[in-house]
């Protein structure tokens, strides 16, 4: 919390792979205030999520999707993960970073990609700005 600006100020794209909501909210809020691109990957058990937010272009944010920390917050240490899932999430995240660097429009921008390693299922969910979002005045 005390050094996020020092770490992030020189980077237009921020990658998040943290496994707790407090840190995700901190990174989300920093990126939206500073108009950064945030590419976030999260995994748990057999499932993964990938977010691609471009806060330069009026994107919804992580708080729009999840306004509060769930009371039953889980993490990789307590629940475990399918080991190949970490590689999948990292590869998908890296792919989104490369597309952002090359200014290639991504269908994932502003959306949530949900993937399941047991069934090899992939779904894309359109994220909308939440009118009650804590960051609604920063969305543009």
Give the location of each predicted region.
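Glycine-rich phosphate/adenylate-binding loop
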Residues: 2-140
């Amino acid at each position: 919390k005390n050094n996020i600006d020092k770490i992030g100020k020189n980077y237009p794209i921020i990658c998040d792979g943290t496994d707790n909501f407090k840190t995700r909210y901190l990174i989300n809020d920093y990126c939206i205030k500073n108009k950064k691109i945030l590419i976030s990957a999260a995994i748990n058990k057999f499932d993964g999520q990938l977010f691609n937010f471009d806060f330069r272009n009026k994107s919804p944010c992580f708080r729009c999707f999840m306004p509060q920390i769930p009371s039953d917050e889980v993490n990789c240490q307590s629940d475990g993960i399918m080991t190949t899932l970490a590689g999948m999430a990292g590869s998908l995240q890296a792919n989104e970073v490369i597309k952002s660097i090359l200014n290639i429009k991504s269908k994932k921008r502003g959306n949530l990609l949900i993937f399941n390693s047991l069934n090899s299922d992939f779904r894309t969910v359109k994220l909308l700005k939440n009118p009650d979002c804590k960051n609604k005045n920063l969305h543009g």
